[in-house]
C-alpha cells in the first residue's frame, strides 16, 4: 500500500497524497547554451516529462532557467549547489521549485535567505541529500554515507527549514548503492510525512543505470514509497523519462500509452518475432491509448502466456494467429503480417 505524504504543489503539478507519481528528468546541455536547453526541454516535455530540473551554477545562469520556463508548460526545478545567491536569482525569475544540497549550500544564514525568498513566492524546496556530498561532520560520525548518515543530514535540514517556519518541503536521499539507498528511504519515510523524490544517483552507464534504477526505484514503489521519480542515466534525458514510465508500468502503476510484451523466443520460433515486437513498439510511440500488446514466438504457449494482453499475435511459419484478450480470432498470413497486425491494433 502506498504511503501517503502531504501534498506539495510544484507549478501545475501536485505531488504527494493520492496524486500520481510524477516522472522527472534533468537537462544535460551546458547552461550557457540557452537555445540548446530550450530545445532539449521541449523534447523532454514531448516525451512526457512532468517535472524538469535545470542546473543553475551562478546567479547569472538564472536567465537559462527563465528561458526554459517560458518555453514549456511543465514545472521547472532549479538545481542549486554551493552558491545560495543562484537560488535567490531563480526565485526572482519565478522558478517552480528549488533543490538545495545540504552538503554544500553553506551556513544556516544562507539557507534562511533561500527560505525567505521561497516563502514570499510560495516556492517549494527540495532537500536533496546525496551520499557523495554529505557534510563532513556527519561523514566523520558515521565513517561512510550510511543510510543513517543520509537520514540525519536530511532531517537536520528539514528541522532547520521548519525552524524558519517553512514546511513546503520535498526530500530526496540518493545514493549510488542500491541497498543503501533503499534502506535510507525506508528509514526516512518512517519518520516524515513530506513527499519523497526517489532515485539512484550516479547509477552508471545506460544499461547498468537502467538495472540499478529499476531495482532501486521500482523496489521503493513496490513498498509504497515515492511521490516523484528520476531515472539517472548516462543518456539523453528523454530516455530517462521513457525509463521512468517503464518502471511505473512494471510495478503496476497506471500509465497512459501502450505496453508491448514479447517472449524471449526459442528454437520453435519460425517468424521474426523480436523484429516485429521492436517495430510494433516503434510505431506505437506517441500513442496515448492504454493497451497491452503481445508479440509471441509460437502458438504453443503464446496465447496462454499473454492472456492478459488486449491484443497479440503468436507466430508460425508464414503466418500468425491473432488473439484478443487471450482468444484466437483469425490467422494473419503473407509477407505483411506486421502491417495487418498494426491495422488490428488501431481498430481497438
Provide a role label for each language-model segment.
Residues 21-27, 52-54, 76-80, 98-100, ...:
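Hydrophobic faces of well-ordered beta-strands that scaffold small-molecule active sites
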Residues 59-80, 113-125, 185-196, 280-282:
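Alpha-helix-loop-beta-strand connector modules within alpha/beta enzyme cores
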Residues 71-74, 92-98, 119-122, 189-195, ...:
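Glycine-enriched alpha-helix->loop->beta-strand junction motifs that scaffold or abut catalytic
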Residues 130-133, 138-285:
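Catalytic alpha/beta core domains of metabolic enzymes, predominantly
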Residues 1-26, 119, 282:
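N-terminal amphipathic alpha-helix/helix-capping segment at the start of soluble metabolic enzymes
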Residues 85-126:
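Hydrophobic or amphipathic alpha-helical targeting/insertion segments
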Residues 34, 45-69, 99-107, 169-178:
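Glycine-rich, proline-tolerant flexible connector loops at the mouths of alpha/beta enzymes
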Residues 18-36, 55, 74-82, 138-151, ...:
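Active-site mouth loops of central-metabolism enzymes
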Amino acid at each position: 500500500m502506498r504511503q501517503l505524504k502531504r501534498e506539495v504543489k510544484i507549478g501545475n503539478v501536485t505531488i504527494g497524497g493520492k496524486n500520481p507519481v510524477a516522472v522527472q528528468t534533468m537537462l544535460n546541455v551546458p547552461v550557457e547554451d540557452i537555445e540548446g536547453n530550450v530545445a532539449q526541454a521541449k523534447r523532454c516535455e514531448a516525451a512526457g516529462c512532468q517535472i524538469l530540473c535545470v542546473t543553475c551554477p551562478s546567479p547569472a545562469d538564472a536567465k537559462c532557467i527563465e528561458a526554459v520556463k517560458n518555453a514549456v508548460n511543465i514545472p521547472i526545478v532549479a538545481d542549486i549547489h554551493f552558491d545560495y545567491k543562484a537560488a535567490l536569482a531563480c526565485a526572482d525569475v519565478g522558478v517552480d521549485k528549488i533543490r538545495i544540497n545540504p552538503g554544500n549550500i553553506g551556513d544556516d544564514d544562507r539557507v534562511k535567505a533561500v527560505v525567505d525568498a521561497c516563502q514570499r513566492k510560495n516556492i517549494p524546496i527540495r532537500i536533496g541529500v546525496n551520499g557523495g556530498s554529505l557534510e563532513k561532520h556527519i561523514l566523520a560520525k558515521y565513517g561512510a554515507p550510511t543510510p543513517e548518515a543520509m537520514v540525519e543530514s536530511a532531517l537536520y535540514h528539514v528541522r532547520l527549514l521548519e525552524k524558519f517556519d517553512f514546511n513546503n518541503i520535498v526530500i530526496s536521499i540518493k545514493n549510488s548503492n542500491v541497498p543503501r539507498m533503499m534502506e535510507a528511504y525506508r528509514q526516512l519515510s518512517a519518520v516524515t510525512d513530506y513527499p519523497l523524490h526517489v532515485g539512484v544517483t550516479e547509477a552508471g552507464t545506460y544499461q547498468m543505470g537502467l538495472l540499478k534504477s529499476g531495482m532501486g526505484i521500482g523496489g521503493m514503489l513496490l513498498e509504497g514509497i515515492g511521490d516523484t521519480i528520476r531515472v539517472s542515466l548516462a543518456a539523453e534525458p528523454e530516455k530517462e523519462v521513457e525509463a521512468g514510465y517503464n518502471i511505473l508500468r512494471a510495478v503496476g502503476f497506471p500509465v497512459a500509452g501502450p505496453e508491448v510484451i514479447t517472449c524471449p523466443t526459442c528454437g520453435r520460433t519460425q517468424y521474426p518475432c523480436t523484429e516485429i515486437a521492436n517495430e510494433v513498439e516503434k510505431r506505437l510511440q506517441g500513442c496515448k491509448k492504454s493497451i497491452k500488446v503481445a508479440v509471441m514466438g509460437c502458438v504453443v504457449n503464446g496465447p496462454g502466456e499473454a492472456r492478459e494482453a488486449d491484443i497479440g499475435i503468436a507466430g508460425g511459419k508464414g503466418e500468425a494467429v491473432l488473439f484478443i484478450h487471450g482468444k484466437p480470432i483469425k490467422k494473419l498470413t503473407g509477407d505483411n503480417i506486421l502491417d495487418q497486425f498494426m491495422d488490428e491494433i488501431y481498430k481497438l
